[in-house]
Amino acid sequence: MSTIPGFNQIQFEGFCRFIDQGLAEELSKFPKIEDTNQEIDFEFFLERYQLVEPLIKERDAVYESLTYSSELYVSARLIWKNDRRRYIQEQTILIGKIPIMTSLGAFIVNGIYRIVINQILQSPGIYYQSELNDNGISVYTGTIISDWGGRLELEIDRKARIWVRVSRQQKLSILVLLSAMGLNIREILENVCYPELFLSFLNDKKKIGSKENAILEFYQQFACVEGDPVFSESLSKDLQKKFFQQRCELGGIGRRNMNRRLNLDIPQNNTFLLPRDILAAADRLIRIKFGMGTLDDMNHLQNKRIRSVADLLQEQFGLALVRLENMARGNIYAALKHNWTPTPQNLVNSTPLTDTYKVFFRLHPLSQVLDRTNPLTQIVHGRKLSYLGPGGLTARTATFPIRDIHPSHYGRICPIDTSEGINVGLIGSLAIHARIGRWGSLESPFYQISERSKGAQMLYLSPGRDEYYMVAAGNSLALNQGIQEEQVVPARYRQEFLTIAWEQVQLRSIFAFQYFSIGASLIPFIEHNDANRALMSSNMQRQAVPLSQSEKCIVGTGLEGQAALDSGALAIAEHEGKIFYTDTDKILLSGNGDTLRIPLVMYQRSNKNTCMHQKPQVRRGKCIKKGQILAYGAATVGGELALGKNVLVAYMPWEGYNFEDAVLISERLVYEDIYTSFHIRKYEIQINQGPERVTNEIPHLEVHLLRNLDKNGIVMLGSWVETGDILVGKLTPQMVKESSYAPEDRLLRTILGMRVYTSKETCLKLPIGGRGRVIDVRWVQSSKTDETEKTESIRVYILQKREIKVGDKVAGRHGNKGIISKILPRQDMPYLQDGRPVDMVFNPLGVPSRMNVGQIFESSLGLAGDLLDRHYRIAPFDERYEQEASRKLVFSELYEASKQTANPWIFEPESPGKSRIFDGRTGDPFEQPVIIGKPYILKLIHQVDDKIHGRSSGRYSRLTQQPLKGRAKKGGQRVGEMEVWALEGFGVAYILQEMLTYKSDHIRARQEVLGTIIFGGRIPTPEDAPESFRLFVRELRSLALELNHFLVSEKTFQLNRKEA
Amino acid sequence: MVREKITVSTRTLQWKCVESAADSKRLLYGRFILSPLMKGQADTIGIAMRRALLGEIEGTCITRAKSEKISHEYATIMGIQESVHEILMNLKEIVLRSNLYGTCEASICVRGPGYVTAQDIILPPYVEIVDNTQHIASLTEPIELVIGLQIEKNRGYLIKAPNTFQDGSYPIDPVFMPVRNANHSIHSYENGNKEILFLEIWTNGSLTPKEALHEASRNLIDLLIPFLHTKEENLSLEDNQHIVPLPPFTFYDKLAKLTKNKKKMALKSIFIDQSELPPRIYNCLKRSNIYTLLDLLNNSQEDLMKMEHFRIEDVKQILGILEKNFVIDLPKNKF
């Protein structure tokens, strides 16, 4: 059996490819720079470039918000060729910094972990398809896709005329394109197989005569120029550059695909579209039209390629070198003009390269902030595949077939792990064993079954190839060689499922998890779950919060170990040695004559505000082997991933408190800290080091709010802070204008004799919902701003301990999720026959319609495992060994548990898995036996504390004057159309009016309300339209439409215009 | 559930401990029977006892820890293997036994290196530790670990917001639940006319199952004692139904507040007809020669009640109106 490849390996391999090949490849493209008088030559030595080990440690980079990067040095040569000085100057020069991948497979840019995810693109080349046009006639097209995603379509119509479409515009004759490319009619006719078709075409269109005309027409189409452009040499050049070189560049892969599809032998280094390609493509199109040749499947993985970190970084490096080249040119010119002596180093500096990467990591859509909710999230993130991003698709326009599962995904892209919502099917996940092959193809391993070699031979196959083998599907094994029926196995062959004899099988899958991603392969009994629910589960496991005390799952799949190991959450011995000191925050290891200091992560914040913490697991004086686990991280126990807790669960209704997936829990989960998690929040304030000052004397505020500040005005370490408390006291000087206050404000100030301050308090206050213990305070100097305006920032880290509470979201591993609806005292919970109260009550109606039966298997087996003190690791698809294997295992374990613990109620033969349980309030048994079990339940990051929100007063949107939305902005709840109907339906006119005026965008009315609250009296009824309506009227006016109303006097018939 | 035949005298109600076991110092088990019971009685007692055992029994726990050197709960101390939070969690687990009322102090004062266990806790004489081997911390360096502890006896569990204490002490969310689990089962005999009640009790060692049974029944009896009194007591609960829903002092209280706020002379000049009273109340007041607010305020609530046709709702209404109009009696200015 082969081992599973490291989960981060995809990222590491990509980065290594960039460092080993990508750099050299791009550097080799760097031209020799000559100045105009050909006096100086500047060039790089390709073979000599060096990356220097980063100056700072990974951990320090995070702490100090720096970029973890290494400097790139290249040997450069400057040759003086003029007569006075004729010599060569060589120097190793610094051309910039390249961010370096860390052991997590991510980069650290400005102290933030960022990961570059793989992009999956249509491979450049030509694809033949048939489509039905508007009249229901099938039209054959050949689409040429260029390296960056541009399209050129060849189309053959009913009369067998061939047209060309450039980026979905009006179609052109193929002859125009070919003429524009520089062929004349004779050359065309000589080089095609079916010249008569071209000839007939020629008769239709007389006007294609010269190359000039063709170029003109083509240019008109391509550039959408109005009028009649006049042919000129520059126009021709422009077309050459913009179209044939930029839009039609095929690249290496594209050239290879074209050659293969069209049976051409154009050399690999010719990466542009040639007239020969078009001619061959047209020939093939004609043949396909007449039923010869096959169409292509665009969604086949064979026609896709992966653009990994290597390609993205290499592309950026190329861009940076172009900038560097321009800089060098400019500097050579300047040096000669101003007569200073250039050296290789002062011709270039490090800004182009460093800046290019900075911009790339900050702004590129595929460079994402590494999600670190829990260890699983970290590794899964690096294995994502995205169809989105530059050169790819957009989420809104992607069609259904692209998002769908394709048979070629088998063993390469996980069929279930994708995001929900608009990106469904566009963001996928790599299967466990998949690797990226040479041409950016995804490869999957198989065992070859052959007569000659007994030992199984493993081979990696690219997407196009495994279809032509008989691949045993692996859901049933021919175990018993003697029995005839078992010699027949299900197999895949050419995207079909067949049942064939075992002898005919050529390949078989190597591993039961082969076609799943990590998230999906952590689901036990996945084969009993509906794929939609498995999808939710693989997504929700990534949202699980590390708990303060983790627990291994009783029922697992066996992949937990590697998931934890590869996640980087554990501290692992890099070499063997002996522990000679351990502490809470470090381990000292001596070996090979030197000591190794392993610092541990202590209550650190992840970017999802969860807490990362390592606990040492080795004693002093112990000898350690290489690779041994020294400390467990968050959500890992015993070197295994431990995201949740095993709790006693009953599936039954309970007073409606589990209606619609709600979950009833016992108080035990609260007071025993079963689902208690730590959350660390970061609060930051910028300090403009000129006028602003940090102080603890803030006269504007009450002393009570300032109680936690030390004498410098920063919150003290270890103090407990609540909402509204000041974390950093800061004063900003201000020119006070008396009139700047609102009138009532001014009045109040006068009445109460409040002082007018010369400075404004701009303190950092703890926002709503924030409370906890201050665990760290940092001063950070921001390095990126100019020297003139030095800004500093203070960061305060606050740790919060959160018990589970009503409104939190919990989920199992089968997509069974719910919200806590009520917390009951343990004596009120239903209890088992031995008096044990259950911990959670799930709704049984949540199972049948969702078709995630795996949860039932898991909970029953979990109960058995808990009683027998056993842990089960079950590979999926155990049904291939025998019929109903899962059920048999669960029942036999339950039976054994019932026998061993002498509790007959655990396994009752008439209702296996179910047991009679009692109501805790009355002691009466429930009417029906109830499924009880111990599944593994996770607490998810969606917690009420982060979401609960109400608004009494707050800011309004500038334009519409309606309350802002969103909790972060202290926004209001939108009273939408349907809510208005509800109020109308109840006839509560005044409440509706209040919603639409005082509480929303009627500026005058809402000010009057303020006044009324202060001075008393009736709240006046607003008479005119609210602000958003006035805005609407003004918008209409800007379209020259006047909307107004007039009052007509009954007596004088005078019009009285009212301003809306 | 019955495994052995037990002979019980059928005459008087008797209880007996039929099985007891100590799995460890912190897990005690006991099984009790009560018999003979009439049909249905076992269920009545059983469920009440189970709930009382689980919910009503008091326990002793460490509720608070204090140490000079620690800056916060999540800090690390040099030379100690555990973080402060882990030590607090370990202290939470410690099982104590006491006959304490209220709170008392205890402390830990240990010098390393070595393990700190429960037996290092210095306790007042009326509190004792159940399991001396319970781990607290392990010191790896010769340092001194000094922790001041607060011990409390209480019921249920507490989750405290630490903000109320700024003295550098850290709350431990204590769980005062000595009974781990309780169960009851019923065995009937004599054609289902008589029943035996089985009670199973698991405790955490701070009291034996037998003691738990005693305490639970005592707590249960305490709750039932009010019913034993032959005469109904004049609880405010019952009074309220037909006398006064207002607590007697609020009226004065509020009036006093108002009087403080405003000068008396102002009150004199305000007539009650300004205050938008309903006509009926207005007439009532008029008849009793109350014209100004000052007059009104000079009457106590009882005085008002003595008036003809004056009801308790009216007093409330007056209060409401006074509060609304009186505090804000400025002329209503139109904006």
Swiss-Prot record, chain A:
Record-annotated membrane-spanning stretches = none
UniProtKB keywords: Chloroplast, DNA-directed RNA polymerase, Nucleotidyltransferase, Plastid, Transcription, Transferase
Q: Which residues form a coiled coil?
A: none
Which cysteines pair up through disulfides? They are: none
Gene Ontology molecular function: DNA binding; DNA-directed RNA polymerase activity; ribonucleoside binding
Q: What does this protein do?
A: DNA-dependent RNA polymerase catalyzes the transcription of DNA into RNA using the four ribonucleoside triphosphates as substrates.
Sequence similarity? Belongs to the RNA polymerase beta chain family.
Q: What is this protein called?
A: DNA-directed RNA polymerase subunit beta
According to its UniProt entry, this protein's organism is Helianthus annuus
Its lineage reads: Eukaryota, Viridiplantae, Streptophyta, Embryophyta, Tracheophyta
From Swiss-Prot, chain B:
- This chain belongs to which protein, by name? DNA-directed RNA polymerase subunit alpha
**Which GO MF terms does the UniProt record name?**
DNA binding; DNA-directed RNA polymerase activity; protein dimerization activity
Q: Which domain of life is it from?
A: Eukaryota
Its Enzyme Commission number?
2.7.7.6
Q: What is known of its domains?
A: The N-terminal domain is essential for RNAP assembly and basal transcription, whereas the C-terminal domain is involved in interaction with transcriptional regulators and with upstream promoter elements.
A single GO cellular-component term from the record reads: chloroplast
* Start and end residues of each stretch annotated as Alpha C-terminal domain (alpha-CTD): 263-335
* Described function: DNA-dependent RNA polymerase catalyzes the transcription of DNA into RNA using the four ribonucleoside triphosphates as substrates.
What quaternary structure, including any partners, is listed in this protein's UniProt entry? In plastids the minimal PEP RNA polymerase catalytic core is composed of four subunits: alpha, beta, beta', and beta''. When a (nuclear-encoded) sigma factor is associated with the core the holoenzyme is formed, which can initiate transcription.
In which family does this protein belong, per the annotation?
A: Belongs to the RNA polymerase alpha chain family.
Where is the protein situated, by its record's location annotation? Plastid, Chloroplast
Alpha N-terminal domain (alpha-NTD) as annotated region, ranges: 1-231
